[in-house]
């Protein structure tokens, strides 16, 4: 983690994309903190797309199609929901400078959402950054059981179909490890990232 940017700092979209291209991403200590930190972990979380695992119980649920899955229809709704405290996380790292920066990336076509809807209501989702053949997962949320997990499955299917090579989760959690997430050393990650940036995929 590096020194913070000045309070209220606006992160230019081009700077943010360059940061991702070098393996760096921004975070805040909490939603009300005006400062942003650049982060470059020594161990990086990824989900190998060819080894993605769907738990048996979730496969059964997927066959029932409990939610309507949409893409890129409500970015504001998704990032706002990701920024809300929940039972799993009392604090969020999404502050106002980060919210503004990723909204600008979405307008440029470099940020995407996967959304779970039921009866016209957004009940789960995730968002992330697309660059070259790499997708950087940022955050997810659920307002109904398994909604974000179903979005993750649909994300991986879409990345495979679009020719992506790398799904970066930044860190690993017990939840993500159930789907095949692993940690890789920074040097190895940077090699994988460089390869993924050589060509372009389609989200």
From Swiss-Prot:
Catalytic activity: N-terminal L-lysyl-[protein] + L-leucyl-tRNA(Leu) = N-terminal L-leucyl-L-lysyl-[protein] + tRNA(Leu) + H(+); N-terminal L-arginyl-[protein] + L-leucyl-tRNA(Leu) = N-terminal L-leucyl-L-arginyl-[protein] + tRNA(Leu) + H(+); L-phenylalanyl-tRNA(Phe) + an N-terminal L-alpha-aminoacyl-[protein] = an N-terminal L-phenylalanyl-L-alpha-aminoacyl-[protein] + tRNA(Phe)
Keywords per UniProt: Acyltransferase, Cytoplasm, Transferase
Coiled coil among keywords: no
Annotated disulfide bonds: none
GO cellular component, one term: cytoplasm
Cellular compartment(s): Cytoplasm
Family matches, as InterPro entries: Acyl_CoA_acyltransferase, Leu/Phe-tRNA_Trfase, Leu/Phe-tRNA_Trfase_C
EC numbers, comma separated: 2.3.2.6
Alphabetical GO biological process terms: protein catabolic process
Annotated GO MF terms: leucyl-tRNA--protein transferase activity
Record function comment: Functions in the N-end rule pathway of protein degradation where it conjugates Leu, Phe and, less efficiently, Met from aminoacyl-tRNAs to the N-termini of proteins containing an N-terminal arginine or lysine.
Family: Belongs to the L/F-transferase family.
Matches recorded under HAMAP family: Leu_Phe_trans (MF_00688)
NCBIfam families: aat (TIGR00667)
Protein name in UniProt: Leucyl/phenylalanyl-tRNA--protein transferase
Gene encoding the protein: aat
């Amino acid at each position: 983690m590096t020194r913070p940017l000045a309070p209220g700092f606006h992160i230019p979209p081009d700077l943010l994309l360059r940061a991702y291209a070098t393996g760096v991403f921004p975070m805040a200590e909490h939603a009300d903190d005006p400062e942003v930190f650049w982060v470059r972990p020594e161990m990086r979380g990824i989900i190998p797309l060819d080894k993605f695992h769907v738990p048996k119980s979730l496969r059964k649920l997927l066959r029932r199609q409990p939610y309507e899955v949409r893409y890129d229809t409500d970015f504001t709704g998704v990032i706002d929901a990701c920024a809300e405290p929940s039972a799993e996380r009392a604090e969020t790292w999404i502050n106002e400078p980060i919210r503004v920066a990723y909204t600008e990336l979405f307008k440029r076509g470099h940020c995407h959402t996967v959304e779970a809807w039921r009866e016209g209501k957004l009940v789960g989702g995730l968002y992330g950054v697309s660059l070259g053949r790499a997708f950087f997962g940022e955050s997810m949320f659920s307002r109904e059981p398994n909604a974000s997990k179903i979005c993750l499955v649909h994300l991986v299917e879409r990345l495979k179909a679009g020719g992506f090579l790398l799904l970066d989760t930044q860190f690993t959690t017990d939840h993500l490890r159930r789907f095949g997430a692993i940690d890789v050393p920074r040097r190895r990650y940077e090699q994988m990232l460089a390869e993924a940036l050589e060509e372009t995929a389609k989200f």
